[in-house]
Amino acid sequence: MQKKDVKKVVLAYSGGLDTSIILKWLQDEYKCEVVTFTADIGQGEEVEPARKKAISLGIKPENIFIEDLREEFVKDFVFPMFRANAIYEGEYLLGTSIARPLIAKRLVEIAAATKADCVSHGATGKGNDQVRFEIGAYALNPNIKVIAPWREWDLNSREKLLAYAEKNGIDISKKKGKSPYSMDANLLHISYEGLVLEDPNHAPEEDMWRWSVSPKNAPDESDIIEIEYKNGDPVAINAKSMKPHEILTELNRLGAKHGIGRLDIVENRYVGMKSRGCYETPGGTIMLKAHRAIESITMDREAAHLKDELMPKYASLVYNGYWFSPERKMLQAAIDESQKNVNGTVRVELYKGNVMVIGRDSKTDNLFNEAYCTFEEDSVYDQKDANGFIKLNALRFIIAGKNGRKF
């Protein structure tokens, strides 16, 4: 792609340091018109200042797109992923990963609407996000072109970025000196990387955590809540129906209050290196525990076991950027089929970093039958039936043993 061939670019724009510099750099290096796209996916910051910043950098008002995508994010991306109980490498709830396909989708759609040649993003050449953004974009438009400034320019340090900003009159509130953590926030989580976290043996500082109280300082009194599920999705809290993004917002509030959802892990990036990250996912941690609880009484055993076998593959696809892939959609179809009878309520107690399931019920799809599993006398289960069941399942061992084979 020749720079002279680029006439218009849609930039994923936050209004922060990196993307403001990218905006100016695109104007200078590519001599092109820039369209900015700012998504509100619940990052907890005002997005309107991005409009003022973009205008100050010469962007036409009609080329500024600021959209509230919180409901679409939770309804069409977070909830489908939580139906799968997706966890990457046993711990990570995929808060950053699941936000990228939605942003890629809107970048491509805005590019089509504005007749732009390219899309651009602020992901570095070391991380997973460049892969997620670009694979998503190519899946939705195979003819799209992508400009990834971090893979082109030489502004490869925070000090160089600040110097570039000062040289070009870009108003950046953060000053030289101690850099902030590299953070990503949305309605599902906040992630932290960099600084002391680059040493995996160095404990994170308490003042790093922005969202949740320390479990040590959480209230001495617990909260007990009831979450209602329909077809595998939460639809109400304490009998109050809510929209998807409202449910996650309320669970975040409750989880953060009780110090729930903090995580410190070393993960394997798709690009090949190991990375240490800290995460806060208060509402997601509650949702995962509650969802597994309602599945435990409504799902058939073999269907549940098969779903658990599929989950790591599903989680890897999301983590690596393959949300729009045919294989993820195939898995999603199977997962969604499994959720048709996942209906009912779960009661959880929230206390000092813990989510404890204390009750689960389903009026319509409960497979738990007390008459069969009671320790008291019953009239529906003949315990003698177990004789044949055990002998048939032991038959291969009996035959092999009689043939002299040792186990």
UniProtKB/Swiss-Prot annotation:
GO terms for cellular component: cytoplasm. It catalyses: L-citrulline + L-aspartate + ATP = 2-(N(omega)-L-arginino)succinate + AMP + diphosphate + H(+). It is found in: Cytoplasm. Its EC number is 6.3.4.5. The keyword Amino-acid biosynthesis applies. This is Argininosuccinate synthase. L-aspartate binds at residues 124, 128-129. L-citrulline binds at residues 92, 97, 128, 132, 182, 191, 267, 279.
